[in-house]
Amino acid sequence: MTVQILPIAASHIPGFGRALDVVAREKRYLSFLEGPPPEAVRAFVLDNIEHGHPQFVALAGDEKLVGWCDARPNSKPIYAHSATLGMGLLPEFRGRGIGTRLIRSTLDAARVKGLHRIELTVREANASAIALYRKVGFLTEGMRMDAVCVDGSYENVLFMALLL
């Protein structure tokens, strides 16, 4: 099945919201446990489009949205050179190189936009994501111990960054 990597468009909002919800409900990857309300998803995407913030989606087969990657610039002036990376893939599309394609597209767009630093947080147990981030050049800057608690289980969170 062919998977296309494209800049997000308004027509992708419903699929993006569904994908966010699926990945969030796994409780293993994102900082929220269910997808945001549709109006919040819509506002996020439209703001990214309006301001040219890097956000890409992976579309499989008949345009099913199966993943995303975005780099949201920091709104505070002293941090405006940096952006926070967020990404996710539906479970059945992991391990196929789609994440690598998504992140490379997003990083390329961040360079064009003039961003200097991309940062992210990742749970220490998410070895595949950490390997992906290292593969594209991210370095670990630090760790917050027991920073996440899901269903009574604590997890460490790594801080990673890449200078463009």
Language-model segments: residues:
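A short beta-loop-alpha structural element at the N-terminal edge
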Residues: 4-16
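Acetyl-CoA-dependent GNAT
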Residues: 7-10, 24, 28-92, 103-105, ...
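Glycine-rich acetyl-CoA-binding "A-motif" of GNAT/NAT acetyltransferases
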Residues: 63-67, 128, 154
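Conserved G/P- and acidic residue-centered "switch" motifs that form tight phosphate/ATP-binding loops
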Residues: 97
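Conserved GNAT acetyl-CoA-binding A-motif
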Residues: 103, 110-121
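Conserved catalytic-core motifs of GNAT/GCN5-like acyltransferases
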Residues: 117-123, 134, 139-155
